[in-house]
Amino acid sequence: MNTGGRLIAGSHNRNEFVLINADENARIRSVQELSGQTCQICRDEIELTVDGEPFVACNECAFPVCRPCYEYERREGNQACPQCKTRFKRLKGSPRVEGDEEEDDIDDLDNEFEYGNNGIGFDQVSEGMSISRRNSGFPQSDLDSAPPGSQIPLLTYGDEDVEISSDRHALIVPPSLGGHGNRVHPVSLSDPTVAAHPRPMVPQKDLAVYGYGSVAWKDRMEEWKRKQNEKLQVVRHEGDPDFEDGDDADFPMMDEGRQPLSRKIPIKSSKINPYRMLIVLRLVILGLFFHYRILHPVKDAYALWLISVICEIWFAVSWVLDQFPKWYPIERETYLDRLSLRYEKEGKPSGLSPVDVFVSTVDPLKEPPLITANTVLSILAVDYPVDKVACYVSDDGAAMLTFEALSETAEFARKWVPFCKKYCIEPRAPEWYFCHKMDYLKNKVHPAFVRERRAMKRDYEEFKVKINALVATAQKVPEDGWTMQDGTPWPGNSVRDHPGMIQVFLGSDGVRDVENNELPRLVYVSREKRPGFDHHKKAGAMNSLIRVSGVLSNAPYLLNVDCDHYINNSKALREAMCFMMDPQSGKKICYVQFPQRFDGIDRHDRYSNRNVVFFDINMKGLDGLQGPIYVGTGCVFRRQALYGFDAPKKKKGPRKTCNCWPKWCLLCFGSRKNRKAKTVAADKKKKNREASKQIHALENIEEGRVTKGSNVEQSTEAMQMKLEKKFGQSPVFVASARMENGGMARNASPACLLKEAIQVISCGYEDKTEWGKEIGWIYGSVTEDILTGFKMHSHGWRSVYCTPKLAAFKGSAPINLSDRLHQVLRWALGSVEIFLSRHCPIWYGYGGGLKWLERLSYINSVVYPWTSLPLIVYCSLPAICLLTGKFIVPEISNYASILFMALFSSIAITGILEMQWGKVGIDDWWRNEQFWVIGGVSAHLFALFQGLLKVLAGVDTNFTVTSKAADDGEFSDLYLFKWTSLLIPPMTLLIINVIGVIVGVSDAISNGYDSWGPLFGRLFFALWVIIHLYPFLKGLLGKQDRMPTIIVVWSILLASILTLLWVRVNPFVAKGGPILEICGLDCL
């Protein structure tokens, strides 16, 4: 890198980069280089001084600035050199300004306003030529980063017009300010009679009236920039593979583009260190607590004591599994400007990697087409190069309603996409953009915006009416099924028996938007279904999309979103690319997971729909280990990682050995046995990487890079057979899988590609392949997301958790408690299936690249449904204690009191510290605690039994799609209780504990003051359960949110039966009873 003898300096935190002269010789050379150069502010030639030397404004870096600009900058600007930021010193003949040092040896006041032979006064310096950067509206860094000899903006931050003569200058309003490059304020710098012109009030006005003609501004500006780039000196950085040799980018921009695209932000030590210390302290307290509990049994209630101790031990193990993965939480920050500097260069095609976006839907009646349409529209309007985005919609229900709705969506996208990109609309899902109560005029300066917004809102309302009409028509299905417009029967009339369907709506036949711009590709996909084939539900649909996209577009990165999760931040793909395309750390990242945020939830969030504790605490903790788990939506994948390849390994340097010692010497702190074990593990890893090496080996063979004596044809055929056995029998798809960086085969006709795409979504394509086993979304559980992420982490990949300030995605949450419990039931059922399968993280994946703390998190994700058994038993103990007068602990001593207080205090303080570093409110934390109990005694319990029946007895459970919110009114059904058997267990527990409290208080009143002491512990125990089940109590007592009568009746009946049964077979009452004797008294 040639720095011209200047010293490189900068600040990473302040995002600054400058070049400073290192010695006087370099400064002299820089001064000599000024001869014949032009001012980098106004483009006038730098004049000579009286001594015949070029005028030098800055003695530190000799940045080329003419005398008038120097004087104006000292008077109206920031009085500093644009390049090195050194304050301009007062030169001979220059007027004094505020802040100048007292100097007696330069000149006197008589010459203070003389400029030598120039004869130019301040009243002759044009205001139109240079306006203070403080009023420009451009960021300061635009000028601060200018290098020596490079083109930097005028002080007005405008551009020069090449058509204007050298003695006249025009301010060009940049397009980013809405001026579209029009010329304003022609002024003369040589004629003092020309007055300075003010800024126009309306820059968008046709400026041909100012006398400059109507020549296309864009053509003239491109020509001017080309000429200027030929004249200006360019500082090139040699040897950088990310920048081509012919780039004319200036040095500071190049340096900025070479910096990392993201960085880790560890939690402050003042927050995380007390948290870690408390975790260790809590472990010690737990040890002392269990030591006391085990050594002090309750003799008259031994069964209660034993059951309670077993439950408490399980809760402690569950807490350890949940706690230690949060040991090292981190946050991350991305730099979108650096991404643009590195991969988006002016005048060249964008270097950003293509992305294929997958949207999955099943039933349009439960997943309204309008919601799916908004998701698709937000994807098509994303802030990303249109030729690098392809949207694939999987319709696993083969519904003609979805097909027709997508057709209407493609037509409306021709208007919506250019509107969003023209006015930088956020969010870009029209339903949420038009319904949100916000100041939509904020930062909008274009006068036509209001008019076009009204027209667009009217167009969207018409679009909604069309979609609603389609939904109404779909309610009445014809007896013979649906037909197309030409009378052909709709292929998907039979949901379980239909051929594969692919329809490319946008991006293929030259369909453009209303402004004649290209649109992203939009493809409808419905895979083939036939009786007798296992279609693997959502996982099978996603694998079909992988293969279709690999044939049609083959982008190296994939984004997966549910049909109800729209893109809320149009720069979401760029946020992910800051990690994926980072040359330093991006190669080992398998996916970037975004948090789930939701609309349609009230601020109280009674049923913990937002799940804030998981997304803002647990996921940040996992990000500090090997990365967050995959949650099923809002995730950007690396295609090669989904193909089952191992993560690239870093080359390790040579290790130190002790060859000078005999083999029996153990000074190397090792043994033969350990070395042998490591060798076995290394051989196992080597075998796991053979598949990934095949691809690169096959590429080498195709390019002719093979070893001497090898049989090219045999090697190619053998590897091709292995790849076809792994990926399937489609040669086009196998060829695309070999391309690590994506891309399409040359000279491939659309007809051939479409034929191959139909083949890869056929029913039998996955037979005798590794799809669903080692490739793509993994089969074997209804929660395929956990298995898929676990597989990739086991191959040594790491994931990243990205939390931009503006939520990347937003979705619809379950409307009421019943739907919420059914959603949790499905998640828990999937965890039970994984726990009982060969992919259980307790015994699967050893010897790979999975870190042990990451393994703990996966174990916790599949073990948590089993906590429902001890939880429901433990929540029943308070009622039993109150009904029988027994308790799970003996009389408490002072030592025991201290232990209990220390344990409860550590639990509370741990929660407080988690809320502090996770930035979670106490309401969200408490709702999460409540729903942990509610879900644990209901959905988790049912999932446990269903999972055991499914795995052990083969009784399959149907997957129920969670209903998405319709637009029937804000929070209309949010607290509506619907009939479901999931509500009976928690309701029964609530009634039993309420009965127990009533019985206990009545007994204490009857027995007097001495009974209140032992009662306090039992009451506290029962109230703890009642408070956690408070939403049910409110539903039982409230008028608006009343619980269904059938649930109340069943719960009361069950509670009464259990209470009477306990009274009948009370194990704590002596079986024999008292011996009656005749006392001789006549008792009446």
Swiss-Prot record:
GO terms for molecular function: cellulose synthase (UDP-forming) activity; zinc ion binding. Mn(2+) binds at K538, D562. The chain crosses the membrane at residues 278-298, 301-321, 869-889, 895-915, 931-951, 981-1001, 1013-1033, 1043-1063. Its EC number is 2.4.1.12. Pathway: Glycan metabolism; plant cellulose biosynthesis. It catalyses: [(1->4)-beta-D-glucosyl](n) + UDP-alpha-D-glucose = [(1->4)-beta-D-glucosyl](n+1) + UDP + H(+). Glycans are attached at N958. This is Cellulose synthase A catalytic subunit 6 [UDP-forming]. The lineage of its organism: Eukaryota, Viridiplantae, Streptophyta, Embryophyta, Tracheophyta.
